Amino acid sequence: MLDIQLLRSNTAAVAERLARRGYDFDTARFDALEERRKSVQVKTEELQASRNSISKQIGALKGQGKHEEAQAAMDQVAQIKTDLEQAAADLDAVQKELDAWLLSIPNLPHESVPPGKDETENVEVRKVGTPREFDFEIKDHVDLGEPLGLDFEGGAKLSGARFTVMRGQIARLHRALAQFMLDTHMLQHGYTEHYTPYIVDDTTLQGTGQLPKFAEDLFHVTRGGDETKTTQYLIPTAEVTLTNTVAGSIIPSEQLPLKLTAHSPCFRSEAGSYGKDTRGLIRQHQFDKVEMVQIVHPEKSYGALEEMVGHAENILKALELPYRVITLCTGDMGFSAAKTYDLEVWVPAQNTYREISSCSNCEDFQARRMKARFKDENGKNRLVHTLNGSGLAVGRTLVAVLENHQNADGSINIPAALQPYMGGVTKLEVK
């Protein structure tokens, strides 16, 4: 959520920054709401002053034996009380309308974010590794994976399109990837592993920015026997739960940064992705991801963003996968982000790079929604900055390992870093 004081003092500048990311901020509507709010507040203050003045007169009038005048004054106070209740209701209505609107407004882009309308204007930062040249006809991950235990028909039979069953060697490799990622982030990068719920309420999703704007992208669930039919949601990412662990908290500054990680399934309806990536694991309704979250001092958040990108890169380097880092332009950033780097891994069968990690600094945007603060060195409570990043998407990493490390006979070489997690197995072979 944006800072309302910043909006009030720099409305035009905020509107201009939002326009950079394609959001049309209605300044006329904001000004009208502000006028309503100010008008009600002025009226409230006038009524309170009048009530206080008249209340002081009542005692004096009674002392002077002017009972009729005292009663008239008491009647005035009673009417003012009614008027104040109405003014409070009017102010509450304006505030609720303003708050609801603020919840739908995206974050302001950082000044270093390149301008652009969509993904075609993202800026490449660096490429790492050289895509392998194959001396045989390459297969995609579907053709490689199905003989090794990747079962798309089984997933469709159980749950419909965009679900997958894994068994045997593929299931083991998928698990090994997640364990390797978690261990790397814990043991090398200093994150604390978490296990968090996969079902959350709307307040939690509002805190990280998925609600109210992106309800159609979520899977809704209701509890059996719940007569009120309270709606809960399957998490679209562990960013939601990890970040919200500090909701409503005041963290001592010496405890910052907090570095949190979790391996979880992610559930997404992919409402706007009909017809995209219909083959294989690239776009699923359910997929696993290892998430990184950092809760940091505001002055250190952009250093933390670079660090987090490096943590995701270390996984790709260890798995011997070519990749590139891009900076998302203003028109392609996520709702809560002030700046985002995407890591894209080389997918040989598609002859292109595909997103495998997204690392974002949300500055105080999520913290304001969650009321997540820290106590600074002067004893003042301030909003923290929150960052999140994929470290990595497990299914897409599986795709990259299968395709980049394939052999002509359909076998898959296991990267050395993964072999301890595979019981020493060095190659997946069709049996």
From Swiss-Prot:
Major localisation: cytoplasm
Transmembrane stretches, start-end: none
Residues annotated as binding L-serine: 237-239, 291, 390
Sequence positions that bind ATP: 268-270, 355-358
UniProt keyword annotations, A-Z: Aminoacyl-tRNA synthetase, ATP-binding, Cytoplasm, Ligase, Nucleotide-binding, Protein biosynthesis
Location(s) in or outside the cell: Cytoplasm
GO cellular component: cytoplasm
A GO term for molecular function: ATP binding
InterPro entries documented for this protein: aa-tRNA-synt_IIb, aa-tRNA-synth_II, aa-tRNA-synth_II/BPL/LPL, Ser-tRNA-ligase_type_1, Ser-tRNA-synth_1_N, SerRS_1_N_sf, SerRS_core, tRNA-bd_arm
This enzyme's EC code(s): 6.1.1.11
PROSITE patterns the record matches: AA_TRNA_LIGASE_II
Pathway: Aminoacyl-tRNA biosynthesis; selenocysteinyl-tRNA(Sec) biosynthesis; L-seryl-tRNA(Sec) from L-serine and tRNA(Sec): step 1/1
One record GO biological process: seryl-tRNA aminoacylation
Task of the protein: Catalyzes the attachment of serine to tRNA(Ser). Is also able to aminoacylate tRNA(Sec) with serine, to form the misacylated tRNA L-seryl-tRNA(Sec), which will be further converted into selenocysteinyl-tRNA(Sec).
UniProt similarity note: Belongs to the class-II aminoacyl-tRNA synthetase family. Type-1 seryl-tRNA synthetase subfamily.
Domain notes: Consists of two distinct domains, a catalytic core and a N-terminal extension that is involved in tRNA binding.
UniProt-listed HAMAP family: Ser_tRNA_synth_type1
Quaternary structure note: Homodimer. The tRNA molecule binds across the dimer.
Protein name: Serine--tRNA ligase
UniProt organism field: Neisseria gonorrhoeae (strain ATCC 700825 / FA 1090)
